[in-house]
């Protein structure tokens, strides 16, 4: 189906290894039967994430565009988003029925935010393996993202992380902004992310999204 105001653009940020590409893959596979989807990935010097999504068959290869930012990944999603906006324009031209475009940033830190000209909603992914103190360190990515995803929760016992502490700190730092724990490799917690996207993105829902884990 086609959204009345053009495709919903969802920015996905997070440090290297947090699970951004896994999140993008899982979201594409859960939503692709219901919505027309495309992806733009950002890497500094390669198109590794785009190639990985193609190998994982998240979407047909022509719906996945990799851009090489050639420098600080923050700039390409915030101060000068032109390379991403050009990729989005090309995808819109090729697929005029698009409902959702995911924009996956390159590896970034807690100061990363998406330009409002680029993303309508922002998801930020951190990993428990980075340490239980990450939520309370704050930064715009933690405090301002529309949905904070604390991934790899299954590994908490092995990296000496207390999930209750992370939950308390995230709630304190984010106020009323939502967050959730996930184990994206197994699809745990994905349903909550999808529900947030559908509700806050104004998507029209049929039956396909009910199959997500």
Swiss-Prot record:
Entry protein name: Urease accessory protein UreG
Annotated transmembrane regions: none
Species name: Mesorhizobium japonicum (strain LMG 29417 / CECT 9101 / MAFF 303099)
MF terms (GO), sorted A to Z: ATP hydrolysis activity; GTP binding; GTPase activity; nickel cation binding
Family: Belongs to the SIMIBI class G3E GTPase family. UreG subfamily.
Subcellular location per the Swiss-Prot or TrEMBL entry: Cytoplasm
InterPro entries xrefs: AAA+_ATPase (IPR003593), CobW/HypB/UreG_nucleotide-bd (IPR003495), P-loop_NTPase (IPR027417), UreG (IPR004400)
Main location per the UniProt record: cytoplasm
Source organism, top-level taxon: Bacteria
Primary gene name: ureG
Self-association state and partner proteins as the record states: Homodimer. UreD, UreF and UreG form a complex that acts as a GTP-hydrolysis-dependent molecular chaperone, activating the urease apoprotein by helping to assemble the nickel containing metallocenter of UreC. The UreE protein probably delivers the nickel.
GO BP term, pick one: urea catabolic process
Positions of GTP binding: 14-21
Keyword terms, alphabetized: Chaperone, Cytoplasm, GTP-binding, Nickel insertion, Nucleotide-binding
Annotated SUPFAM superfamilies: P-loop containing nucleoside triphosphate hydrolases
Keyword ATP-binding: no
Presence of the UniProt keyword Nucleotide-binding in the record: yes
Entry GO CC: cytoplasm
CDD domains linked: UreG
Role description: Facilitates the functional incorporation of the urease nickel metallocenter. This process requires GTP hydrolysis, probably effectuated by UreG.
HAMAP family per UniProt: UreG (MF_01389)
């Amino acid at each position: 189906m086609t959204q009345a105001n053009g495709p919903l653009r969802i920015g996905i940020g997070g440090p290297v290894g947090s699970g951004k590409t896994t999140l993008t893959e899982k979201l594409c596979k859960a939503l692709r039967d219901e919505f027309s989807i495309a992806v733009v990935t950002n890497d500094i010097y390669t198109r590794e994430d785009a190639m990985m999504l193609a190998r994982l068959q998240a979407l047909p290869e022509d719906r996945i565009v990799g851009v090489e930012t050639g420098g600080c990944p923050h700039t390409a999603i915030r101060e000068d988003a032109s390379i991403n906006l050009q990729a989005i324009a090309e995808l819109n031209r090729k697929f005029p029925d698009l409902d959702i475009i995911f924009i996956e940033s390159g590896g970034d830190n807690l100061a990363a935010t998406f330009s409002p000209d680029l993303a309508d909603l922002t998801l930020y992914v951190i990993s428990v393996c980075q340490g239980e103190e990450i939520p309370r360190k704050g930064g715009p990515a933690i405090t301002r993202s529309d949905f904070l995803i604390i991934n790899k929760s299954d590994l908490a016992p092995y990296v000496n992380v207390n999930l209750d502490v992370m939950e308390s700190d995230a709630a304190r730092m984010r106020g009323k902004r939502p967050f959730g724990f996930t184990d994206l490799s197994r699809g745990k917690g994905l349903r909550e992310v999808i529900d947030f996207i559908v509700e806050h993105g104004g998507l029209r829902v049929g039956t396909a999204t009910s199959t997500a884990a």
